[in-house]
């Protein structure tokens, strides 16, 4: 079947950006339609009756492992990365080994008749993930005030400054910028940036149009 929207996690308050998703936004030719923040609750899950001292390794999605790094270090556990937390919980159930635990949800523990050995184990008590809804065609949300763009610059001194200067001169607030290496290039980078603004504002539209004309690569990911 076909779906109009997908949901992807782009950033976590503890572990930072999910770089693979940023790559997918560019490589998959996707646009951002909206965003929302959600509190993420992680539990340590194992065979019923397991004591923490019995656990030697923990399995989960890489982001969950990063978000729970303090407890993993405290218990001295080795880590194994899995494609998602549900797969990790199933892995523990299939292994039926007290030395292996998973990071996942209490619901997943119930599904596989496992036990929550320790609850809410994220390093940060305010463990929040930002999710975006994505689609193929650009869709501006009602009341949109956030703009996401991706661009590259020429590899010459001052090139990034010249990109950012128009934002300052027009009072456009830059809330985030980070770089990602371009695969197969010799230390060339894509820059992902979030701005405060609305593309229906003539000043904002003018700045973005100028950048699109001047830069080697420029894409408006979304206004939401």
Q: Which residues does each predicted region cover?
A:
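Domain-level signature for soluble enzymes in the chorismate/prephenate branch of the shikimate pathway
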Residues: 1-224
């Amino acid at each position: 079947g076909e779906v109009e929207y997908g949901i992807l996690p782009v950033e976590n308050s503890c572990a930072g950006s999910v770089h693979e998703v940023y790559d997918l936004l560019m490589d998959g030719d996707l646009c951002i339609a909206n965003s929302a923040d959600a509190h993420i609750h992680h539990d340590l899950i194992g065979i019923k009756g397991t004591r923490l001292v019995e656990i030697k390794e923990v399995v989960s999605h890489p982001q969950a492992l990063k978000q729970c790094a303090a407890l993993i270090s405290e218990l001295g556990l080795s880590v194994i990365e899995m494609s998602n937390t549900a797969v990790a919980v199933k892995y523990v159930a299939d292994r039926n080994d007290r030395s292996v635990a998973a990071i996942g949800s209490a619901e997943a523990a119930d599904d596989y008749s496992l036990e929550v050995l320790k609850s809410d184990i994220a390093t940060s008590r305010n463990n929040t993930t930002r999710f975006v809804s994505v689609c193929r065609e650009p869709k501006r949300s009602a009341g949109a005030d956030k703009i996401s763009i991706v661009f590259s610059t020429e590899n010459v001194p001052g090139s990034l400054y010249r990109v950012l200067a128009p934002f300052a001169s027009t009072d456009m607030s830059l809330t985030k910028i980070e770089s990602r290496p371009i695969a197969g290039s010799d230390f060339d980078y894509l820059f992902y940036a979030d701005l405060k603004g609305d593309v229906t504002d003539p000043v904002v539209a003018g700045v973005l149009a100028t950048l699109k004309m001047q830069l080697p690569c420029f894409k408006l990911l979304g206004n939401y």
